[in-house]
């Protein structure tokens, strides 16, 4: 069954394996999540649990009422986790980092850093033109396509807004679980800026 928890990206550091190997890790702070709702096929058409992380500062009345059913404070970051055995969880139950163990493979979903308006070279990894004297083509997008269609086809790599998108990194290994400080140490990097919210779930392709 799927396991999942919400957390906050703290940053990156490195730890040493028993054989002395240096492992770069991302530290994710995952304070106990609260189960806010259980969704069933009868009432919602599918099965899932809704979990919340981090108390909201200025909740509205609907959010307050929804959280009150779980006897908790309104949450700022709320997500649904599918594929969970509903018999094993109850509304108001806390989910902590011990859900996972060292060696587990997980998928981490976050929002990538916003880069603003960027050109085709940075945004689409295009090659630039020659920078030598006489060249009139340096960092431009290149050909817009053939003349005959009288238009630019969809999908043409052009400048535009970059980043700020939901991205999932798959099959990342959990190196260490720190129950005392509610920390998950995940091998490699995960999307998002420091202090951004991330979702950690069991790997789909593991």
Curated annotation (Swiss-Prot):
* Subunit description: Part of the 50S ribosomal subunit. Forms a cluster with proteins L14 and L19.
Domain of life, source organism: Bacteria
**One of the record's GO molecular function terms:** rRNA binding
Supply the name of the protein: Large ribosomal subunit protein uL3
**What is this protein for, i.e. what is its function?**
One of the primary rRNA binding proteins, it binds directly near the 3'-end of the 23S rRNA, where it nucleates assembly of the 50S subunit.
Please give the residue ranges the record annotates as the region Disordered: 116-149
Write out the GO biological process terms: translation
* Keywords recorded for this protein, A-Z: Ribonucleoprotein, Ribosomal protein, RNA-binding, rRNA-binding
Q: Which GO terms describe its cellular component?
A: cytosolic large ribosomal subunit
Identify its protein family. Belongs to the universal ribosomal protein uL3 family.
Instruction: Cite the HAMAP family for this sequence.
Output: Ribosomal_uL3_B (MF_01325_B)
Read off the PROSITE patterns from this record: RIBOSOMAL_L3
